[in-house]
Amino acid sequence: MSRSRKETVTCPKCGKESDITIWDTLNAEMNPKEKQQLLDGTIFRFMCECGYTAGIDAGMLYHNMTRHTMVYYVSEESVEQTENMFADIRKHGEFEMADYKYRIVTSQNALREKAAILENDLDDRVMELVKLFYYVHVHEQHPEEEIDEVLFFTEGGQWLLQFLGSASMTAELPVEFYEKIRDQYAARLEEAGNEGLHINARWAVRFLGYDED
């Protein structure tokens, strides 16, 4: 089930009041239009008739029933509370949710990326490993650039990685490379399990035994 609410905002440019929709819970199957807005980022954007645009920051629980996955975008201050909530669901939840994956993210970019990974039926653990290998390669090729974040997204059916930092760069991600990493680490990933709540760059660094510094 999806849950949304209306809020009224005032445009700081023209002063006009507008109603916006805040999605507290978004079900991918029940709301395909809003799912696409999440994928392209517009669901977190306010656009006034005068042309003014601004970001909207609000937490969201994203539910993809097809992939048996819930992703919760929360503030850093709410992480522990969300961890406890997911622990309770695992302990007392309905039987059909026993094989669900639960993830916690603390940025809109990370939520959009998780949604894109689910949309393409990929494993976010494998994707984090792929991104880490690309990060190391790009850092070696461009040591002068600071890379703050690497994000997976798709465009026109093409898999891409975006490098955000002192300079924005984009690289194509061949399907074959993803499959190579998936197969190479399949046994270790199976052994590690898929119950982690925080599957991100730090997880990938720890999984590969790299120095987090």
Language-model-detected regions and their locations in the chain:
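N-terminal cysteine/histidine-rich coordination modules
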Residues: 1-76
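Context-gated lysine
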Residues: 6, 13-16, 33-35, 91, ...
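A broadly tuned preference for mixed-charge, low-complexity surface segments
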Residues: 26-29, 60-71, 110, 159-162, ...
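General N-terminal targeting signals
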Residues: 35-39, 63, 71-73, 78-79, ...
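Domain-exit/linker segments immediately C-terminal to small folded modules
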Residues: 47-127
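C-terminal, charged low-complexity interaction regions
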Residues: 129-213
